[in-house]
């Protein structure tokens, strides 16, 4: 059984961890959101499996729901917020998939941010 990692915004579970890719099941609680962030060494593919939420990619925010897909290229600023029932998605990371490859620009939970870093 995989371990569920609790976060202030929800939780995730690593389903598969290989040298060049990782697969996670992620749940974002209702009206919570993870950091506005980007990654220097990995891209992400999100397949929404349950719920509805708001995805931000660069400066554009849109509604995303079960059955939809989002691609997050390397260095793209992004964030996801859960809707009224939260949102669950399968995330496939490709590249160097380390948990410390997160550059936070904004965070609702007081975690360190780095607004001075260029993501270009």
For each of these PLM feature ranges, what is it?
Residues 2-7, 79-120:
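Double-stranded beta-helix
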Residues 41-54, 58-59:
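Glycine- and acidic-residue-biased ligand/ion/polar-headgroup-sensing regions
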Residues 30-32, 41-42, 60, 76, ...:
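A generic "binding-loop/recognition-motif" signal
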Residues 24, 34, 60-62, 101-103:
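Short beta-strand segments
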Residues 58-77:
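Short acidic-glycine-tyrosine-enriched beta hairpin
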Residues 35-36, 55-57, 91:
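Short hydrophobic/aromatic-rich beta-strand segments that constitute the beta-sheet cores
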Residues 2-38, 42-43:
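A short glycine-rich, His/Asp/Glu-containing loop-to-beta-strand
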């Amino acid at each position: 059984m995989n371990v569920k990692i609790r976060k202030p915004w929800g939780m995730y579970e690593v389903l598969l961890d290989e040298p060049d890719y990782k697969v996670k099941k992620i749940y974002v609680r209702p009206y919570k959101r993870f950091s506005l962030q980007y990654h220097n060494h990995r891209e992400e593919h999100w397949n929404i499996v349950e719920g509805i939420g708001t995805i931000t990619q660069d400066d554009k925010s849109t509604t995303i729901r079960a059955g939809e897909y989002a691609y997050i290229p390397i260095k793209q600023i992004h964030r996801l917020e859960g809707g009224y029932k939260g949102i669950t998605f399968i995330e496939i990371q490709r590249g160097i998939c380390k948990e410390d490859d997160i550059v936070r620009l904004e965070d609702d939970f007081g975690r360190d941010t780095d607004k001075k870093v260029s993501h270009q």
